[in-house]
Amino acid sequence: MSESYAKIARDGLWDKNIVTGQMLALCPTLAITGTATNGLGMGLATTVVLILSNVVISALRKTIAPEIRIPAFILIIAAIVTVVDLALNAWLHDLHKVLGLFIALIVTNCAILGRAEAFASRFGVLASALDGLMMGIGFTLALVVVGAIREILGSGTLFAQASLLLGPHFAFMELQIFPDYPGFLIMILPPGGFLVVGGLFALKRIIDARKPTIEQEIKQMRTERVFTAAGVLKPKLETGEEA
C-alpha cells in the first residue's frame, strides 16, 4: 500500500506533472505566471478543486451511470469551482481580481477532468484525495517556478505584492532580488512564458533521460556493498584496485 501511495506522489510531483509531464493547463500557466505570487494563488485554488472533485467523484463512483459520467463529472467540478471562486472573491478579493476569469476557467482544465476519469472514478476516496493533493502540489510548484523565473528576470523581484494578494501574513515572502533593476519586459509578457515553460520541458526530458543510468549505478553500488559485507567481494581502494 505504501508503495502505491509513493507512486501516486511521484506521478503527481514529477512523472505525470500536469505542466511538465502531461503538458496540460498551459493557458493559465502562460497567462497568469507573470509573478510567483499569481502562480501560487492559482495553484492553490486548483489544488483545492482537484482534491474536492476527486473525493466527491470517488465517493459517488458507484452511483453514477457510465453513460453519463462525463457530464456528471463536469457538473461536480463546476459546482466546486463556483464555491472556490466565491470564497476567493470574499476572502482574497485582490487576488481574485488579478486571477479574474482564469478561476472560472478551472472548470475547463483538462487535468481535473482527466484525473476524475482516470483515477477518482476507479479508486477509493483516500487514494483519490492523495492523487488530487499530489497533482495539485505538482501543478502549484510548476506555476511558482515559472512565475519566479519570469518575475526575477522580468522585474528583479520575487513574490511581489504577496501581502496584498494573499494577505498581510505573507509579507515575509516579498523579496527585491536586483535593486534598481531596469527590467526585461519580454519575460513578464506571454512570449516569456513560452520561453520559460519550454526550458522546463527540455530540463525534465534531460533529467528523465539520465534517470535509468543513475538508478542502474545506485543499484550496482548497493549490490557491491552487499557482496562486500558478505565477504564475496574485497573492498576497493581509492585507486579503484581491490585490496
From Swiss-Prot:
Principal localisation = membrane
Task: Extract the Pfam families matched here.
Answer: Rnf-Nqr (PF02508)
Keywords on record: Electron transport, Membrane, Nitrogen fixation, Translocase, Transmembrane, Transmembrane helix, Transport
Quote the subcellular location field of this record.
Answer: Cellular chromatophore membrane
What triggers expression? Answer: Expression is reduced under iron-limiting conditions.
- Report the sequence similarity comment from the record: Belongs to the NqrDE/RnfAE family.
Q: How does it assemble?
A: The complex is composed of six subunits: RnfA, RnfB, RnfC, RnfD, RnfE and RnfG.
What is the name of the protein in this document? Answer: Ion-translocating oxidoreductase complex subunit E
Could you tell me which species this protein originates from?
A: Rhodobacter capsulatus (Rhodopseudomonas capsulata)
